[in-house]
Amino acid sequence: MRILVVGAGAVGGYFGGRLLEAGRDVTFLVRPRRAAELAKNGLIIRSPLGDFHRPSPPVVSREDLAEPFDLVLLSCKAYDLDGAMDSFAKAVGESTAILPLLNGMRHLDVLAGRFGPKPLLGGQCVISATLGGDGAIVHFNDMHALSFGELDGSRSKRIETIASELVGTAGFDARLSDEIRQEMWEKWVFIASAAGITSLMRSSVGAYVAAGASDLAAGLLDECAGIAAGEGFQPREAALARARAVLTAAGSPLKASMLRDIEGGKPVEGDQILGDLLRRAAKPDDRSLLRIATLHVRAYEAQRTLGETSAKR
């Protein structure tokens, strides 16, 4: 199976690198700067679960992409999706499967609008990693899980073939799911709650718990779960219990990646994670925590845009 990994950042680089390590036929679609970095230093993974280095990994540029692949693994930020689709369009053929690992659910509609629904799979991952200053992928803990499946829950021939490439021997915890839409919704509920409350409080979980805001975190989780239920995907009790425990854990250093991006002055996936969920609410409440968190992040984005505009004058 020929696998195209779109980008070689923290997520795509990690999972693609582990697939390379396991002997899979992997090519990275990268921009010229990242291509030069990989040619010079190789693909480097530093992880508690084992380091990996592949000198001169297989790469291709958008301009040189000439034929379809069997599987496209997509892990870009949601705000980069349009450009990413343009870059890998020539890799999508009649039998190509696209496995996106983006946050939220809106990307499924965007991808289907471009390529049709046939190629699309559902997918999600759990990993904490970043790209170091030297271009190495730094993995922080022992979590490196990826679940995937047909969006209708079927066990198609193609999903079984993909599972044979990924499950058990790919160098990370891969799992074929018959309920991938449910799992994607449960993850969205959690990350929206975590992003919303840590960004709103501008603090780690432990800090806002110490300040007495545990009830706000729990309330935001309940609100997000209610929206999911209204869409037909009531989060299961076990998923809610795990999320509640994480979001109310005393002393926890956890910050959502959205807050880390805000602290770094970077772009954020505010509309994809928070705004889209808010729009799906049956009866939006002007004083809802989700609305307040969404507007808080929008204000950051507006201020960031104003700052960039002023800097160009």
Predicted features and spans:
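NAD(P)+-binding Rossmann beta1-loop-alpha1 motif at the extreme N-terminus of oxidoreductases
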Residues: M1-D51
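Short, well-ordered alpha-helices that flank and scaffold nucleotide-derived cofactor binding pockets
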Residues: G17, E21, D86-K90, G113, ...
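Residues at the C-termini of beta-strands that transition into short coil/loop
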Residues: V30, L49, E63, L102, ...
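Short, charged/polar "capping" segments at the starts of alpha-helices
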Residues: R34-E37, L108-D109, S156
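Rossmann-like NAD(P)(H) cofactor-binding subdomain of soluble oxidoreductases
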Residues: F52-A136
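Internal alpha-helical scaffold of NAD(P)-dependent oxidoreductase catalytic cores
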Residues: K90-A91, G113-L121, D134-A238
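NAD(P)-dependent Rossmann-like dehydrogenase/reductase catalytic/cofactor-binding core
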Residues: A218-R313
